[in-house]
């Protein structure tokens, strides 16, 4: 794991921070060393008592096929099992800053910063998709092309359960996490004036790009099933998550997108998450410190 690409490590840590509960790979490795055969047997026995099964049919299957499958797994359901649980993710809170730090044996550094909206639902998710669409080229051009900070310079929408946010990330051979954080801040302020100057035509072009991505014909069964699986995990029996998100993108306004940027990225309107992977070359330069 320590030799894995720095940006991959940072993104993996980011995904772990969005889950409840979560552990990084080091904690799992340490816990594994203490596992005994008796302990494993006790865990398996407890798991079987609470074993739950959810059967969901999708594609070329009939109702009879699904019911037959349900009957076949019914004997394995644990005596203490309740209803299937919904997927659990963190709930962003206004003004909270989370800071994950880790030294790396590799020379490069990586910084990933996320801004998570405490308002959940399709409207928030739509605004984040549109905001990322407006910022992706600008972030890459500034930090990768102009400042040449690293191999990877990217923005990305953050989608978790019913929540959403926006993230920025760089892997760099020329700056530690503190230096990268300074360049991120410089970009954030510059981007505000750029967002305020976005034309209606550019915004509509970004909107149509997002809508095209959401409504395109799936290339694989797995791609088509992904949206249904998300609804299933969240207990959305209407299975209309994609339709609701598409409708929210269609009605979102440029003013709403700019305001959410001002509130979340430049203000303390949500939860701010830093993932810092400090390369060995920059260990003496210190960490980014954001309050």
Residue map of PLM features:
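C-terminal regions of mature proteins
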Residues: 13-16, 25, 29-35, 39-73, ...
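Second-shell loop/turn segments in exported
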Residues: 25-31, 52-59, 117-120, 125-130, ...
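Buried hydrophobic packing residues in well-ordered domains
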Residues: 40, 55, 113, 129, ...
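Short, conserved charged micro-motifs
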Residues: 63-68, 121-125, 175-182, 283-285
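A glycine-rich, aromatic-flanked flexible loop/lid motif
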Residues: 98-113, 144-166, 175-184
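M16/insulysin-pitrilysin zinc metalloprotease superfamily fold
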Residues: 134, 138, 142, 158-218
